[in-house]
């Protein structure tokens, strides 16, 4: 274990978080907020600067990062950023509990959008902005963001980025990894700006459009108001948000093909076609199922398309009370919670590509039992998928199911009903946000459950393994 490089890079990342807090500080100045808010932000910046400078005083002799160090850096960074990112809420007295603040910012950085707040009105503009700003930074990945702006290009960035970017296969769009991070972030931020401008043109205030765009771009779903998108009573805004979140659930590497004018490669992608097919089929089924509630096709389509888009992308914006929908529609949405968006997107969940691979493995196993002598291979985008990747997906599925079941078991100790407990486990681990049931706030859970769900959100965002390393004694050994 190269502990010195872990300490050095974590310290650098804490300095970056301190710098990011300048943004909500500016928002506090714009809205003339009270001294307590300024003190809370500046106090947190001071703590981060102290720890960051202390950790970078002694440079490591060996800059090489191996797989274990890469995964450990990623896990520690997300936990520490969530903890320190929550301190302004605690110091300002707007979320007095440290555990609640950790939960809220874990939800922010992991782009989950789950909240312990029953009323967003308790937050000042600056801290409301800070928790949504976490969506924007966490959407493409905290470490991808850091890699895009850091000058250091030593060995090992591949291990760090591979540990953070979701999906079974990690690929670079260009030869240099730093350039890959920069290209992805330029595409991401450009789409975010376009999204925010369109929302503003649709009638939102500048502040609301930025907050909503950050929630949509990061597929997190934090909103300005308690009733989320329903607050605006605008079909135009509803459809802009629906399509916008759907586009952020697409693999960002595919957008690079568009920049290269390789449109054919974009539309030939098998995961993309499956992703849109799932959206279309799910929307159609729900329209048929809820038509009796709304009694017209326009409203049935609007609500169905919006909820399918916001759930499969794991955004979690709200428009209507889906608990009043028939059980069949709720079941479809629960299934979409588990599937999630595309690999390489800002969306969470199991990922469409993994679901495709599992389905194809199941098909091949069925065919093998019928035709024992037939040689079967698994193809994705016209290429044979190697056995190692297939096995890694199956192993991930096993761990994924085990963690979901464990979460449901632990959360059931709070004596909530089964639908709430199951959706809480699925919602936090898949980084979705909303609860299915009688409550849409996680304040109903005990502090221990909220702490566990905070770590579950990070585990889900990092796809389990990096966070698990933190709790293995062997991780901290010198060998």
Regions found by a protein language model. Give the residues of each.
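Membrane-proximal intracellular helices of multi-pass ion channels
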Residues: 1-479
